[in-house]
Each structure stands twice: as structure tokens, then as C-alpha cells.
Swiss-Prot record:
This is Argininosuccinate synthase. L-citrulline binds at residues 85, 90, 121, 125, 176, 185, 261, 273. It is found in: Cytoplasm. InterPro entries: Arginosuc_syn_C, Arginosuc_syn_N, Arginosuc_synth, Arginosuc_synth_CS, Arginosuc_synth_type_1_subfam, AS_cat/multimer_dom_body, Rossmann-like_a/b/a_fold. Belongs to the argininosuccinate synthase family. Type 1 subfamily. It comes from Ehrlichia ruminantium (strain Gardel). Gene3D superfamilies: Argininosuccinate synthetase, chain A, domain 2 (3.90.1260.10), HUPs (3.40.50.620), Single helix bin (1.20.5.470). GO terms for cellular component: cytoplasm. PROSITE patterns: ARGININOSUCCIN_SYN_1, ARGININOSUCCIN_SYN_2. L-aspartate binds at residues 117, 121-122. Pathway: Amino-acid biosynthesis; L-arginine biosynthesis; L-arginine from L-ornithine and carbamoyl phosphate: step 2/3. ATP binds at residues 7-15, 34, 115. It catalyses: L-citrulline + L-aspartate + ATP = 2-(N(omega)-L-arginino)succinate + AMP + diphosphate + H(+). Its main location: cytoplasm.
């Protein structure tokens, strides 16, 4: 191999991988860090890479692209995996993989590498993305190749090679954490026992509902063509809007979930997720659709959503079938305009109002107090008789 582009976070795993690649492949390693809202100090990451004699370091701000082209399209589908997971990690991998391949082409690299473990979903997501963007690229997955089979052995390797091992609040190696503008996930350590209650001091974006404000907060989110564009009438870019919702939702204990999910490779895993802004957006988007989308179309969306979510979770973002579903989902997005009013209180998101110039809601038809024009109560009798025919025993 001539040159390798490593997806580099500056954390323990990828710092060890960087050193390991240099030792075992005897070629230049380019590092690429995508700033997608993880709130890491990018200058520290650059210094870490430079300290390991890396000559080409790419640190790129991709927050707007991430939210605009990946998060928002996913939320147009009201996407949720297995009832709880808003796919915060899953949706970040396609963008990182795409840009990693672009950097490989730019620098003349013939291989890419990632830090995903051999037990997880991310190895699949990264590599599906690589092969969709460049079928001939060589892929190095150190966790499937080296003899460092546990986090303990990884830490020992790091210490022997003078690689800094970050410590958490109790002076121990931290949880396995993945963060971006959409969410933060925590895995490993005591969480590997699904019956043990989490130590919520781990949270960095949110207060727990018990510690959240005792005063409800009302906000309004404005939608245009299916995407949020403003909070309380203040226009915001996609990344800034999600950032603001994270701040607002975090102080009210919104979007903290403890789940056991089914990984694509067949293993069950437990994680704690913080998704304050995304949780608010999911409720708001469903609310604007409830008045702008007709019944059968809404039900169809609910039927295809699990398939769409499964495709993203399993790493199939770039596939034809995902793009086909996206086209179907986006077909009527021009109608999804309006404003949703939401109350936030101690972990709960309550939609308290919605309005749209494209609303299909009719007060005259829905009201018990008005004489409905165009609807005769007597018509319901025939409707019931016809639709009950199959229920009657012969």
C-alpha cells in the first residue's frame, strides 16, 4: 500500500490505530477528522496527530452538510429504529465515509482505515460507504486484524507507546462514546449489564428529568418544505437550529434513552443515548404532518418508515432502495409548511399547537358544535353497513 487515510477522532482507539498502521504497513498515514458537532477541541486533535509524525492532517467542518443533507432528510421520514433509537451514530457514517474516499483520491491514497470494532455496526456502515463511493478501494479494519482484543490490551499498548489515555470523572478509562450534533451515545463498562441502572453523571448534553427545570418552556418551530427553518421566529441554519434545540432540550431532560438494540451482525447491545434536539424535532415534524398529510399517505409513511430506518441502521444509505424511499417520502414535502408549538417539561415533549396554510384540518367538519357543510350524519350509516359486510357471519 502506498498511503492510507484514517478516519481519526483523536480518541484512544484511533490514536492506537494510527501508531499501529505506521508500524505495520510502513507507509504514510493521512488522518481525517470530521467536525460534525462532537464539540471536541480540534486543535488538540491536530496536535495529537502531529505528535505521531503525521504530515497530512484534514480537519473539516461538516456540521451544516451533516444536518442539511443527512439528518433532515432522515427526519422527513419520522425515522426511528426499534421504537427508541433516532439513529444518531448511524446517520453520521455515510458522510464520513464519503469524505474519506474523496480525501483518498485527493492525496493519492489507495487505502482507507477506520476504528470500528469487529463486533459492532460501524464496521459495516463505513465499509458499505467506502465501496459505494469507490469499489476498488482497499480497506483496513485493525480491530479485525490485530491481537489487541480488549480495551485493556488497547490501553496497555497506548501506555507503552506514550499515547495519552483519557480518563473520565472517576479516574478510569471512559465509556465508549460517539458524539455529533444529533446525539451522544455511551456504551461499555457497567452498561454491559442490562439490569444495572446507569450512572447518569456520564451525561454531557442533558440534565436528567429529576434535575431539570421545574418551569415548563414553550417554543415554536417553523417548517418549510418539511424541514425546520426557525425557532421562535428566528431563522437559523440547519446546524445552528439543531444546536439550539439541543441546548433547549438538554436543560429540560429531553431525549435520554436507555435501550438494548439489535445490531446488524446479530449481537444485542445496550447503550445510553442523549438526543434532545432530535427528540423535539421528531415530535414537531409529526405534528406538522398531522395537519398537512392525508390519512392514507400518512399511514403509508408509517408503514415504510421501519424499512427506511433499518436501511440506515444497517449502513445502506447510498443504496438505490434508500434513494427510492427518499424520493417517495420527499414527494409531498412542499406541503409541509407551518408552525408547531411545543411545551417542554422534565423529560416530556408535548405538542400544544400546530398551524399551516396547507392544513387539511377543517374546523367545520371536526366540530361537534357546528353544522357541517358537505357532510350528512346519515351518510355514516351506509358507510358502516358496507364496511361491516365481511364481519357478519353467514
Amino acid at each position: 500500500m502506498k498511503k492510507i487515510v484514517l478516519a481519526y477522532s483523536g480518541g484512544l482507539d484511533t490514536s492506537v490505530i494510527l501508531k499501529w498502521l505506521q508500524e505495520n504497513y510502513n507507509c504514510e498515514v493521512v488522518v481525517f477528522t470530521a467536525d460534525i458537532g462532537q464539540e471536541d477541541d480540534m486543535s488538540v486533535i491536530q496536535k495529537k496527530a502531529a505528535a505521531l509524525n503525521v504530515k497530512e492532517i484534514f480537519i473539516e467542518d461538516l456540521k451544516e452538510e451533516f444536518v442539511r443533507d443527512f439528518v433532515f432528510p432522515m427526519f422527513r421520514a419520522n425515522t426511528i429504529y426499534e421504537g427508541y433509537y433516532l439513529l444518531g451514530t448511524s446517520i453520521a457514517r455515510p458522510l464520513i465515509a464519503k469524505r474519506q474516499i474523496e480525501i483518498a483520491h485527493l492525496t493519492g491514497a489507495d487505502a482507507v482505515a477506520h476504528g470500528a470494532t469487529g463486533k459492532g455496526n460501524d464496521q459495516v456502515r463505513f465499509e458499505f460507504g467506502y465501496y459505494c463511493c469507490d469499489p476498488n478501494i482497499k480497506v483496513i479494519a485493525p480491530w479485525r486484524q490485530w491481537e489487541l482484543t480488549s480495551r485493556h490490551s488497547l490501553i496497555e499498548y497506548a501506555r507503552k507507546n506514550n499515547i495519552n489515555v483519557p480518563l473520565d470523572k472517576v479516574n478510569e478509562p471512559p465509556y465508549s462514546i460517539d458524539a455529533n450534533l444529533l446525539h451522544i451515545s455511551y456504551e461499555g463498562k457497567s452498561l454491559e449489564d442490562p439490569y444495572v441502572e446507569p450512572d447518569y453523571t456520564m451525561l454531557s448534553r442533558s440534565l436528567t428529568p429529576e434535575l431539570a427545570s421545574s418551569i415548563p418552556e414553550y417554543i415554536e418551530i417553523t417548517f418549510e418544505q418539511g424541514d425546520p427553518i426557525a425557532i421562535n421566529d428566528i431563522p437559523l441554519s440547519p446546524a445552528n437550529l439543531l444546536h439550539q434545540l439541543n441546548k433547549i432540550g438538554g436543560k429540560h431532560g429531553i431525549g435520554i434513552v436507555d435501550i438494548v438494540e439489535n445490531r446488524y451482525i446479530g449481537i444485542k447491545s445496550r447503550g445510553i443515548y442523549e438526543t434532545p434536539g432530535g427528540t423535539i424535532l421528531l415530535h414537531a415534524h409529526r405534528a406538522i404532518e398531522s395537519i398537512t398529510l392525508d390519512r392514507e399517505s400518512a399511514h403509508l409513511k408509517d408503514e415504510i418508515m421501519p424499512k427506511y430506518a433499518k436501511l440506515i441502521y444497517n449502513g445502506y444509505w447510498w443504496t438505490t432502495e434508500r434513494k427510492m424511499l427518499q424520493s417517495l417520502i420527499d414527494n409531498h414535502k412542499k406541503k409541509f409548511n407551518g408552525t408547531v408549538r411545543i411545551k417542554l417539561y422534565k423529560g416530556s415533549v408535548v405538542v400544544v399547537g400546530r398551524k399551516s396554510n396547507n392544513s387539511l384540518y377543517s374546523y367545520n367538519l371536526a366540530s361537534f358544535d357546528s353544522e357541517s357543510q358537505g357532510y350528512d350524519h346519515k351518510d355514516a350509516e351506509g358507510f358502516i353497513k358496507v364496511n361491516s359486510l365481511r364481519l357478519k357471519k353467514s
